[in-house]
């Protein structure tokens, strides 16, 4: 029970990074997004510097914040349809590229965001870092 979307789980350990939000149904503020992106990069860079093959799940808007690693955008943050559509394929791609750990940005749980976060949370085994 509760693992209906276990097939989304990549072989690598996935950590989801999300801002501490009182209202998860709200969209993230620009400040929250920037704080989250900064933490994803900090965590990823520590692993990259240690010689680990790191995957990073980001959005089109934050792609430039990640100069190293196996970086994959799953679409524009405002286009939840494309993010939802691309999620499974990106997770499988990290398997093909032999990522050892993956860090992912999170999404507000408005509209399709709730389904996206549900799948990401389950794929991460509920390993979440809140910033």
Segments the model singles out, each with a brief description of its role:
Residues 2-125, 129:
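A C-terminal functional module that forms or caps the active site or interfaces directly
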């Amino acid at each position: 029970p509760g693992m209906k979307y276990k097939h989304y789980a990549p072989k690598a350990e996935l950590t989801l990074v999300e801002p501490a939000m009182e209202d998860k149904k709200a969209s993230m503020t620009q400040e929250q997004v920037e704080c989250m992106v900064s933490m994803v990069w900090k965590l990823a860079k520590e692993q990259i510097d240690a010689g680990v093959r790191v995957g990073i799940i980001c959005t089109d808007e934050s792609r430039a914040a990640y100069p190293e690693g196996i970086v994959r955008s799953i679409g524009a943050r405002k286009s939840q349809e494309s993010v939802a559509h691309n999620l499974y394929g990106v997770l499988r791609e990290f398997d093909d590229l032999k990522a050892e750990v993956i860090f992912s940005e999170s999404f507000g749980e408005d509209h399709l965001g709730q389904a996206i976060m549900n799948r990401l949370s389950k794929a991460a085994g509920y390993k979440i870092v809140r910033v």
